[in-house]
A protein has these predicted regions:
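Conserved catalytic-core segments of large NTP-driven translation/proteostasis enzymes
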Residues: 6, 125, 142-295
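Alpha-helical scaffold elements adjacent to nucleotide-binding pockets in ATP/GTP-utilizing enzyme cores
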Residues: 27-30, 102-109, 135-143, 167-175
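Conserved G1/Walker A P-loop phosphate-binding module
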Residues: 2-69
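Residue-level signature of catalytic and energy-coupling elements of molecular machines
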Residues: 21, 27, 46, 66-68, ...
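Conserved Switch II/interswitch segment of TRAFAC-class P-loop GTPases
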Residues: 69-74, 84-106, 111, 115-135
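C-terminal effector modules of nucleic-acid-centric enzymes and ribosome-associated factors
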Residues: 16, 128-133, 142, 154, ...
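Conserved nucleotide-binding/hydrolysis micro-motifs of P-loop NTPases
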Residues: 72-73, 96-100, 115, 124-129, ...
Length: 655
């Protein structure tokens, strides 16, 4: 079967949602002719408590996967697991009862899981008169108006009489077609690896272990070797079913995999299958979190450190929601970037959606999308990290790649970027082409390897190389040079051999260093040159100290001191590294003492103004021109000494 033919088979998952006893299973039986209740207890109780799966043929000829999830409040976990991977939701609402608690809860879950297409099936119309049906439609319309499903079509139907079923199928076909292109796009990601959250695991006599789930990210084929997390069970795919035997399944399809390998019989719901080294698990991640509060209870804030159940894929782990440093508790309806700390590992990738339940009693309280699947243990974000999360939240891949590179201390490979951000290498390469052409990212080639670095990070690495060589020559004035390993270890202790070689090659191309034979050296390493630079540093600092906050621009400093360009450049580099001077503009620097004095003046002015002051007040306190004052104030903002509140009319306060 060709991939094009398989696409017409089922890359879209349709799932039901709705309150208990509103007729979801009966509706599916009317649509498909099959009863989704697969457990004896379900048939006896007349409700779905586990996950029912099947297929649905639409009028256009498309065959889509169908998921029926439980509506009872006690089975919220099963509902979340079943809703994971749904592309189009069928919200089932009884025309007799209208919107009920689990109706609301299920819609919230669908929003949190990123579902955007919905059809509302107004069921049991055979038990309601025209007025009741109209009231139910108004009730549904009013509820959905505050959600992403505000435009969802509402179709009255009766599973018992068959009235409206054909119309429902036609509308559902339209919704499936609306998300068809996106489903095709996920199939065509050539550099992705498959992931399968396991929602069922059972044994078939004569075949062995079978697991089912919704396939994510990439195709899987017979013969593929997979690994399960967190158990790390290694297995091989012996057979695949997608509404019948097939050699290959596509992402977005409901699949059953027949697995062979040691330990496969112990696999269970909650584990995730994937390609070893192409996916991982985490104990900490960053996410965009929407706090819903608890349905039907008095609204209350969410405190940092709240213990919760985190559900992603089909897994559930206990953890804590950590608000960022200095943030107030979350009010109901708020959306923020938060850190989630888990008590056990959770298989997760950036872009996945997670649902959060309160610890006890277990109730839906929120969820959202994962921004970064692995992060450091800190609630205080730097400006660079905030820029990274803003880019990831907006879906700006190039911005996210650039922001992540700006946070690294050394060059990295495209694979490093892809692993950190859970992107395909092709996506990273496309983003890097634009960043390199803009000049914000530099590419370093050594042999067959390509390394990448933020331009500012690379400049800092070159500064470190220059300072290291200067120090090594000063400590060993008789040495003509040093081994690359010794230089790299001193300049960049964390660099591996490949990164070190790339940085030294870059240093040679810039004239920062030179290499001859097995030695690396400063081409200007004569003792006299070193003394000249030291003396230049002393004279520059003395001049800047005397000038205070009204220091001349750096080219004028060089002219006044009669320093040649090379000496001036080397002196400024050394002074910046040892923090004797502080640049407030590209061509303006203050001595460390002057910058400290500026801080004192600004702090005093802000305190005198009652905790916040305008630029005009601060300029008067600094006693310099408006242009210089703005440069100094923006520098103090950048180093997090002050903070500018644009919404408050440009007032600055101390951090």
């Amino acid at each position: 079967m060709s991939e094009a033919e398989a696409l017409e088979e089922c890359p879209v998952i349709v799932g039901t949602a709705g309150h208990v006893d509103h007729g979801k299973s009966a509706l599916i039986e009317a649509l498909t002719g099959k009863n989704p209740d697969r457990l004896e207890v379900e048939r006896r109780r007349g409700m779905t408590v586990e996950l029912g799966f099947g297929e649905l043929a639409l009028p256009s000829g498309k065959i889509v996967g169908l998921v029926d999830v439980p509506g009872h409040a006690h089975y919220l976990r099963a509902m979340v697991q079943g809703a994971t991977g749904i592309d189009v939701a069928v919200l089932v609402v009884s025309a007799v009862e209208g919107v009920m608690p689990q109706t609301r809860e299920h819609v919230h879950v669908l929003e949190l899981l990123g579902v955007t297409h919905m059809v509302v099936a107004l069921t049991m119309c055979d038990l309601a008169d025209a007025e009741m049906i109209e009231l139910a439609e108004l009730d549904v319309d009013d509820f959905l108006s505050g959600t992403v499903f505000a435009e969802a079509p509402i179709v009255p139907a009766s599973s018992k009489t068959g009235e409206g079923i054909d119309g429902l199928l036609a509308v559902l076909d339209e919704q499936v077609s609306a998300c068809w292109d996106a489903c095709r796009d996920r199939v065509e990601r050539s550099d992705a690896a498959p992931r399968l959250p396991i929602d069922r695991c059972f044994t078939i006599k004569g075949a062995g272990t079978v697991v089912t789930g919704t396939l994510h990210d990439a195709p899987v084929a017979v013969g593929d070797e997979l690994m399960a997390l967190p158990s790390r069970t290694v297995c091989r795919v012996r057979g695949i079913q997608v509404h019948g035997d097939t050699p290959r399944a596509l992402p977005g399809q409901r699949v059953a995999l027949n697995l062979v390998g040691d330990g496969v019989s112990a696999l269970d719901r909650g584990e995730m299958l994937g390609v070893a080294d192409r996916f991982g698990q985490t104990l900490r991640f960053m996410m965009t979190f929407t706090y819903l509060g608890r349905e039907g209870t008095k609204p209350r804030v969410l405190e940092s450190g709240a213990r919760v159940h985190v559900m992603a894929g089909t897994a559930e782990v206990v953890g804590r929601i950590m608000l960022l440093e200095g943030e107030a508790p979350m009010a109901v309806g708020e959306t923020r970037t938060v850190q989630v700390r888990l008590e056990d590992p959770l298989p997760l990738c950036a872009g996945d959606h997670a649902v959060v339940l309160s610890y006890s009693p277990v109730m839906l309280i929120g969820g959202g999308r994962v921004l970064l699947s692995r992060c450091r243990r800190s609630r205080e974000l730097s400006a660079g990290e905030r820029a990274l999360f803003a880019a990831l939240e907006s879906g700006d891949t190039a911005g996210g790649v650039g922001a992540w590179l700006a946070l690294q201390m050394l060059p990295v490979t495209a694979v490093d970027v892809a692993d950190a951000l859970d992107l395909g290498v092709g996506e990273v390469d496309a983003a890097l082409r634009g960043l390199v052409s803009q000049g914000s990212v530099r590419k370093l080639a050594v042999g067959d390897a390509d390394y990448l670095a933020d331009a500012v990070v690379l400049d800092a690495a070159m500064d470190a190389l220059a300072a290291t060589l200067s120090a090594m020559h000063a400590a060993s004035p008789k040495e003509t040079g040093f081994t690359p390993g010794a230089v790299a270890h001193a300049a960049w202790p964390a660099a591996d051999d490949g990164v070190a070689a790339a940085l030294i090659a870059e240093g040679c191309s810039r004239g920062v260093c030179a290499a001859e034979g097995a030695e690396v050296f400063d081409p200007h390493s004569a003792a006299a040159a070193a003394r000249v630079v030291r003396e230049a540093c002393e004279r520059i600092v003395a001049l800047l100290d005397e000038a205070g906050l009204d220091a001349p621009i750096l080219p004028e400093v060089g002219e006044q001191l009669q320093l040649d360009r090379d000496t001036m450049t080397r002196a400024l580099r050394e002074l910046s590294l040892n923090r004797s001077i502080v640049k407030v503009e590209c061509d303006v620097a203050l001595s460390a003492a002057a910058e400290a004095h500026a801080r004192e003046l600004v702090a005093a002015a802000i305190e005198a103004a009652g905790g916040a002051a305008t630029t005009s007040v601060l300029r008067e306190a600094l006693g310099v021109s408006r242009k210089r004052a703005i440069s100094i104030l923006e520098h103090l903002d950048a180093v997090r000494f002050t903070v500018l509140d644009k919404e408050a009319g440009g007032l600055r306060s101390l951090r």
